Amino acid sequence: ASGQDFMRF
């Protein structure tokens, strides 16, 4: 997972 992947939540 990328660093910005968590921003999808």
Curated annotation (Swiss-Prot):
Supply the alphabetized keyword list.
Amidation, Neuropeptide, Secreted
Q: Which cysteines are cross-linked by disulfides?
A: none
Residues where Phenylalanine amide is found: F9
The principal localisation class reads secreted
**Carries keyword Lipid metabolism?**
no
Q: Extract one GO BP annotation from the record.
A: neuropeptide signaling pathway
Q: Where in the cell is it found?
A: Secreted
Assigned GO CC terms: extracellular region
Family to which the UniProt record says this protein belongs: Belongs to the FARP (FMRFamide related peptide) family.
The name on file for this protein is: CalliFMRFamide-6
* Gene source species: Calliphora vomitoria
